[in-house]
């Protein structure tokens, strides 16, 4: 019989598998814009590593021996680092979706874009520092993970980056379709709700599950948008071919008609009229 932890780990692993499949689809696809494809690929790969690491952290928590000691520490480190890296890649993906067609950006927008990248980088640096200072978490003698008093900083840093992205998404929402807008918003709203819940409840990876759901939504909407773009391009190509064919037929038809009238003028003026 499965207990709650087994179901929890299974959900994380299935989320990782889907993220890997999505990454493979992005890698094999040649129909996406190159930069958009790259950002989506990085997001899905990072999400897969995040979910796998989280599953290992839960599976081996309290495990004895050197392998359990190493796996618990490495996997927890990767969970925190990947969370900030996903924010970095999401920020890049968001900026591409919002601005790749609009051209120039004002100074305030440029500042927010740079601040978004910087926030994610600061988050990674703080995670590295925490490995030597127990800033975010520590492990007891039985190899169990525990939060440190400053754990909330690990939530506030990515939330700051998310709020920056939220201002960009809301301000420039007209630059993207409704579906893409909702998918981008989901990455901010779902983890934010999970983070608030996580402050009062510990025992399940609510934030990472929320991130995986938003990754699914972004992948699905990106594929749907690409299908629509391909259908539009195919329709435009068909219309162009028809137009070219008609442009070739019309002069030929006109020449034949005038030639027939010319000959009828000599034979039957009434019929020619």
Which functions belong to the PLM regions below?
Residues 1-21, 151:
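Hydrophobic transmembrane alpha-helical segments in integral membrane proteins
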Residues 2-6, 70-82, 143-155:
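Short aromatic-rich membrane-water interface segments that cap or initiate transmembrane helices
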Residues 12-31, 36-69, 75-93, 116-131, ...:
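Hydrophobic alpha-helical transmembrane segments of multi-pass membrane proteins
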Residues 21-27, 89-93, 155-175:
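Alpha-helical transmembrane segments in multipass membrane proteins, preferentially the mid-helix core
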Residues 27-41, 66, 95-112, 169-180:
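Membrane-interface helix-boundary motifs at transmembrane edges
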Residues 89-92, 96-160:
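Membrane-proximal helix-loop-helix units in multi-pass membrane proteins
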Residues 168-233:
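Interfacial "cap-and-anchor" motif at the non-cytosolic start of specific transmembrane alpha-helices
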Residues 207-273:
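Two-component histidine phosphotransfer core
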């Amino acid at each position: 019989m499965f207990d709650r932890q087994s179901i929890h780990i299974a959900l994380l692993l299935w989320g990782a598998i889907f993220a890997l499949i999505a990454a493979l689809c992005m890698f094999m696809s040649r129909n996406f814009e190159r930069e958009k494809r790259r950002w989506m690929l990085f997001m899905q790969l990072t999400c897969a590593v995040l979910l796998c690491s989280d599953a290992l952290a839960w599976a081996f928590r309290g495990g004895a021996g050197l392998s359990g000691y190493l796996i618990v520490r490495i996997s927890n480190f990767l969970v925190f680092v990947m969370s900030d890296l996903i924010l970095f890649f999401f920020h890049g993906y968001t900026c591409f979706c919002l601005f790749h067609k609009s051209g120039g950006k004002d100074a305030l927008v440029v500042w927010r874009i740079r601040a978004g990248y910087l926030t994610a980088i600061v988050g990674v640096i703080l995670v590295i520092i925490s490995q030597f200072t127990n800033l975010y978490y520590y492990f007891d003698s039985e190899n169990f993970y525990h939060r440190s008093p400053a754990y909330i900083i690990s939530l506030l840093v990515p939330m700051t980056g998310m709020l920056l992205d939220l201002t960009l998404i809301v301000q420039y929402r007209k630059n993207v379709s409704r579906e893409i807008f909702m998918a981008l918003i989901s990455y901010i709203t779902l983890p934010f709700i999970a983070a608030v819940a996580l402050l009062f409840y510990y025992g399940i990876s609510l934030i990472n599950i929320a991130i995986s759901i938003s990754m699914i939504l972004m992948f699905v909407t990106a594929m749907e948008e690409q299908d629509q773009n391909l259908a539009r391009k195919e329709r435009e190509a068909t219309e162009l071919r028809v137009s070219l064919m008609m442009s070739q037929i019309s002069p030929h038809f006109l020449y034949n008609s005038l030639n027939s009238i010319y000959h009828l003028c000599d034979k039957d003026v009434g019929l020619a009229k």
